[in-house]
A protein has these predicted regions:
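ABC ATP-binding cassette signature C-motif
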Residues: 1-237
């Protein structure tokens, strides 16, 4: 609630206030260095806001996919790395075992017994993502997931919340249902729909990012592009 954050003298997030609904999948966009990753880290509790408060419900389980893969034990076998978290992940279709999940992520049965140190950088990234998903989060924070997270894999989350930083237009159009855009002075503007809907809304208003930057020197006042319906306490986390 009313969260602000300044880093190294730069106001990155200015009086941000939002209640996340159960079914929301939020895409955070903006220029490099504007505060997108900072916002995710505050949501995960890795850093604290300078003012305001982030409230997290008692039943929330957060999974956080950072931009960089954390250190791994290179001697550990792929299947062991995943089973350290869980033997299976529950879905509406039933339990999916760690081995089955690995196959979904392109690790065939033989590869599952490969030492982690033998994996390529991309394979380690996929393995890291799977480990986050095996924790069965109901809120998933993704910092530039790139091509590692395909659309079918998102079904594992079922009705969970997704908050993602991404520059991938296809991903944003197919995964998110609301865009949060950094538009200057630490302000976030919210738009209903995916990235194409965001562009269309900007065009309708006659205020593309380039035009607004020229007119206002990159400073945009905070607003919500589409009115939000009143939220029930039961719908929020």
């Amino acid at each position: 609630h009313h969260v602000s954050k300044t880093i190294e003298g730069r106001l990155l997030i200015n009086d941000f206030d939002h209640i996340v609904l159960r079914d929301q999948r939020l895409g955070i966009i903006g220029p490099n260095g504007c505060g997108k990753s900072t916002l995710l880290k505050m949501a995960d509790g890795l850093i604290l806001p300078d003012s305001g408060e982030i409230q997290i419900g008692e039943t929330i389980r957060i999974g956080y996919l950072a931009q960089n893969v954390p250190d791994m034990d290179g001697r550990q076998r792929v299947i062991v790395y995943i089973r350290e978290v869980a033997e299976y992940v529950p879905t509406k279709e039933g339990r999916i075992t760690a081995s089955q999940m690995l196959e979904r992520f392109l690790f065939d049965p033989a590869m599952q017994y490969t030492p982690v140190e033998k994996l390529s950088g991309g394979e380690k990234r996929r393995l890291y993502l799977l480990k986050v998903l095996m924790e069965a989060p109901n809120v998933l924070l993704l910092d530039e997931p790139g091509n590692d997270l395909d659309i079918p894999t998102m079904t594992i989350l079922e009705d969970g919340i997704v908050i993602t930083v991404s520059h991938d237009r296809y991903f944003l159009d197919n995964v998110v249902n609301r865009i949060m855009a950094f538009e200057g002075d630490g302000r976030l503007v919210q738009y209903e729909g995916g990235y194409t809907d965001y562009l269309e809304a900007k065009e309708r208003k006659g205020q593309s990012l380039e035009t607004r930057s020229d007119m206002n020197g990159g400073t945009v006042q905070g607003e919500t592009a589409e009115p939000e319906k009143k939220k029930s306490a039961a719908d929020t986390w």
